[in-house]
Amino acid sequence: GFFDLAKKVVGGIRNALGI
């Protein structure tokens, strides 16, 4: 669903910021 996709996007952003 949309929230699953949004969660994946947010996770990717947080992962990028963690670098």
From Swiss-Prot:
One of its GO terms (cellular component) is extracellular region. One of its GO terms (biological process) is defense response to bacterium. Disulfide bonds: none annotated. Expressed by the skin dorsal glands. It comes from the Eukaryota. It is found in: Secreted. Keywords: Amphibian defense peptide, Antibiotic, Antimicrobial, Secreted. Shows a medium antibacterial activity against B.cereus, L.mesenteriodes and S.uberis. This is Uperin-2.3. It comes from Uperoleia inundata.
